[in-house]
């Protein structure tokens, strides 16, 4: 029975996406990954995050909103085509679980995040679902909690797939859609992982 090695969502926020995942996947080796120059690359990432923020994913307690999140999944599929082409995808009532098959049988890694956001109340300097890119920032509900994490994980895997990289162990990407109200999204993912004998 394998156990999962968990990576908190915030780990990907301070470094370029692929560097984070490559560091985790090859912890005993010096990485030859060179962070790209800021500029076009940074703008590409900002535009992806902006598009994700513009798709409103507010979740409400005890309301079936799976269809809303299926729409958000289409945004992810368009932004990260290789992830959707190469990884095994499982959708559980709007919750996502991807499996990236590794070459060995070492302990799997699970990268966790969530797709949902809390309601946008009060006054905003920029409209909450505008995804405006201004003053060196992406503005809007979900930029830090936590679509930036979702984007970082997907972008990292997308870039590594483009390089032809295959991890030495299985890597899972899990993203629930009811985190903001402690709903049943994460427990459903856990149940699937138990079904796979991973926990």
Model-derived features: positions:
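Terminal single-pass membrane anchor helices
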Residues: 1-7
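Acidic/His- and Gly-rich active-site-bordering loop/insert found
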Residues: 5, 12-143, 162-167
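Acidic/histidine-rich catalytic neighborhood of metal-dependent amide-processing enzymes
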Residues: 144-199
């Amino acid at each position: 029975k394998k156990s999962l090695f968990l990576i908190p969502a915030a780990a990907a926020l301070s470094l370029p996406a692929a560097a984070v995942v490559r560091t985790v996947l090859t912890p005993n080796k010096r990485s030859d990954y060179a962070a790209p120059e800021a500029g076009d690359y940074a703008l590409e990432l900002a535009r992806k995050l902006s598009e994700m923020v513009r798709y409103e994913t507010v979740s409400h307690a005890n309301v079936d909103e799976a269809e809303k999140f299926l729409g958000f999944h289409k945004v992810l599929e368009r932004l990260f085509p290789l992830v959707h082409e190469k990884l095994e995808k499982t959708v559980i009532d709007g919750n996502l679980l991807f499996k990236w098959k590794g070459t060995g049988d070492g302990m799997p890694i699970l990268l966790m995040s969530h797709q949902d956001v809390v309601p946008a109340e009060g006054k905003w300097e920029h409209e909450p679902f505008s995804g405006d890119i201004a003053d060196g920032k992406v503005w809007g509900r979900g930029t830090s909690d936590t679509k930036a994490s979702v984007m970082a994980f997907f972008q990292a895997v997308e870039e590594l797939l483009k390089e032809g990289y295959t991890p030495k162990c299985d890597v899972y990407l899990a993203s629930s859609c009811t985190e903001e109200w402690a709903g049943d999204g994460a427990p459903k993912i856990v149940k699937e992982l138990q079904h796979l004998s991973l926990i």
